[in-house]
Every structure is written in C-alpha cells, then in structure tokens.
Regions:
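Base-recognition residues in the alpha-helical recognition helix of bacterial helix-turn-helix
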Residues: 35-40, 51-54, 69
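A short, Lys/Arg-rich alpha-helix, primarily the initiator
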Residues: 1-19
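DNA major-groove recognition helix of helix-turn-helix/homeodomain DNA-binding modules
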Residues: 49-66
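Short, charged recognition helix plus adjacent turn
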Residues: 2-4, 58, 68-72
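The alpha-helix within a helix-turn-helix
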Residues: 17, 28, 57
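Residue-level detection of the helix-turn-helix DNA-binding "recognition helix"
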Residues: 18, 32, 43, 72
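Short alpha-helical DNA-recognition segment
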Residues: 21-40
Length: 72
C-alpha cells in the first residue's frame, strides 16, 4: 500500500475515533484489532487489508467507501 495512503487513512481513523470520543481500548474491543496494530494504523505504518477496513469503518459509523473517500 502506498505510504501516503497509509498516512491519510491513519490520520482519518485517529481523528474520527477521537471526535466520536472512542478510546483506543474500546475501539480495539469493538473491532477485534489489537492495540499495537491500531497504534500502527493510526501512525500510518500499518498495511490495511479489506478485512480490517470492513471492521474499522462501521466502528467509526462509516462505510468503507466513506472511509476511503477522496483518497486516490
């Protein structure tokens, strides 16, 4: 995955999670994602799979399309 895309997605996940008032612990429980993996996602160093995107987006109240909107 392109480094720029990982950075944008990571920022978007972190900002949206914080805006919703969801702690990292609660987000990890809701998605089944480990805390170290969430940390890597949010700092833009993790590679995303579609499976992970389909876990993250609903936990943020979004569709995968909305999560990826504007990223080329």
């Amino acid at each position: 995955m392109d480094e720029r895309v990982k950075q944008i997605l990571g920022r978007r996940v972190e900002e949206t999670r914080k805006d919703l008032g969801i702690s990292k612990v609660d987000f990890c429980v809701a998605t089944g994602i480990s805390r170290p993996y969430l940390d890597r996602i949010e700092d833009g160093t993790a590679n995303f799979t579609l499976k992970v995107l389909f876990k993250i987006a609903p936990a943020l109240g979004m569709t995968v399309s909305e999560l990826l909107e504007g990223i080329e």
